[in-house]
Amino acid sequence: MSEATAATAAIGKCWSVYLVRAENGALYCGISDDPLRRFDTHCSGKGARFFHSSPARALVYVEACASKGDALRRERAIKALSKRAKERLLVGVPVLREVGEPAI
């Protein structure tokens, strides 16, 4: 095991809460230890059923959390917000990745 891998294992996974914009403009909120990979999964049609009616189009927000529990609590708080309040979270935040863009 490399030093970097050992350090990551000692610290634990970094969890994030993320928002994905669907083709119809709706926002989907979820958590993941790898939001870019999860976005790619949503785009491939193998992610949440939410995207069956309107495909994922852009990863628009990612917020790092200290633990999985913190990410779950933040996800619940964001899901409780109105659409308008969720849109306010995105003001000034650049789109992180759109469908078809290569992984960095």
UniProtKB/Swiss-Prot annotation:
GIY-YIG domain sequence ranges: 13-88
Protein name as catalogued: UPF0213 protein PA3854
Pfam families assigned: GIY-YIG (PF01541)
Alphabetical list of SUPFAM superfamilies matching this protein: GIY-YIG endonuclease
InterPro entries: GIY-YIG_endonuc, GIY-YIG_endonuc_sf, UPF0213_domain
Organism the protein comes from: Pseudomonas aeruginosa (strain ATCC 15692 / DSM 22644 / CIP 104116 / JCM 14847 / LMG 12228 / 1C / PRS 101 / PAO1)
The family this protein is said to belong to: Belongs to the UPF0213 family.
